[in-house]
Amino acid sequence: MYKLFTLLCFVFLFTKSAKSQTSDSTKVNSLEQQFSDSITQINEQNEHLKASRDAYNEGLFLLKNKNYNEAIPCFTKAIGIDSIFFQAYLSRAKCYEKSDDNLAIADYLKTFELDSTNLLPLYEVASLYLKTDKSLAKEMYTTILSLKGDEYLAISQLGVIAFMAEKYEVAEQLFTQSLVININAYTLNDRGSCYRKLDKLDLAISDYLAAIALNSNLAFIYSNLASVYAKQGETDKALIYYDLAISKDANYALAYNNKASVLLGENKFEKAKIEIDKALEADAEYAPAYNNKGVINHKMKKYKEAIAAFDKAIQIDVDYAKAYLNRGISKQMIRDEDGACFDWEKAKELGILMAKKYLANDCE
């Protein structure tokens, strides 16, 4: 009986052991399968990520070479594989800027949604809004400041919007607020331009000189400073700073044209003409240079040549009020009274008060 019990126990234990081994083997096989599946999944994910990055890098190469339309499908492919690839959205937005602002804005906003630590996409959106809707741009810069109150660039851009709206005192305050956070040549220049508009010329000069001290390579600051000296009647200083502006940018049409205006004011017509020719060489579609060319020819009693120059200025800018006024004066000199009155009427419509005087004296 004892032997039989022992045998039964052995058989039971063996059976239990066998079942345990079978169970352990099943568990091991299951774990091995899970591990294998995990490795396969990781490999597939890596392949997808590699495909996404390869498409992105191809897009970057095309973007760098300004092949914007060709780059867009590459970034779209990268995003299709990896929907949270915010760098691809950002790069595609840069491409869309060349053809569709709305698509660019959508991608910039998506970029910020995926990476809210980077405010650059919001600045880009504000910049696009600035071209068509300044109120939306203002809202976006205000949003940036609500996220990070010391964003001096956003404050400066609000100043630019105020300046464009001819709210010079508001703009000056915003530029000053920005400069408290960060002193830089661009904002000093912008505040100087506010002072110039407000006829605080000494303060304007101070800001322009401070801006030049910080960055001596920005041609437009020299030109702005020259314009203040010209306004003060310090023509020698004005000419010096226009020359400095031109030395920084040999294709600076505005500086050539403004230098010509100073020379024209001194009745140095031949020298002024040389500067106008340089302005038009730098930019053949620069309407103010054609207007000045017309004034020079008028002063030299070349009235038909003057009219031709004014014609060109108006062809480039159909709302160029001063060109209409000046062309009317030249037309009067060749006895084209109807043409003169037409031009003065147009100048009046565009806001030139002096045109009313000519209309009253010669057209009524």
Segments (PLM) and residue ranges:
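Terminal, low-structured helical/coil segments at or just beyond the last alpha-helical repeat
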Residues: D24-H48, I329-E364
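Residue-level recognition of tetratricopeptide repeat
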Residues: A51, F85, N118, E151, ...
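Conserved alpha-helical positions within TPR/SEL1-like repeat arrays
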Residues: Y56, L60, Q87-K94, L120-S127, ...
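Structural motif corresponding to the intra-repeat A-B loop/turn of tetratricopeptide repeats
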Residues: N65, K98-S99, K131-T132, A165, ...
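Canonical positions in the second alpha-helix
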Residues: A78, K110-T111, T143-I144, Q177-S178, ...
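Structural marker of alpha-solenoid helical repeat scaffolds
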Residues: I81, L114, L147, V180-I181, ...
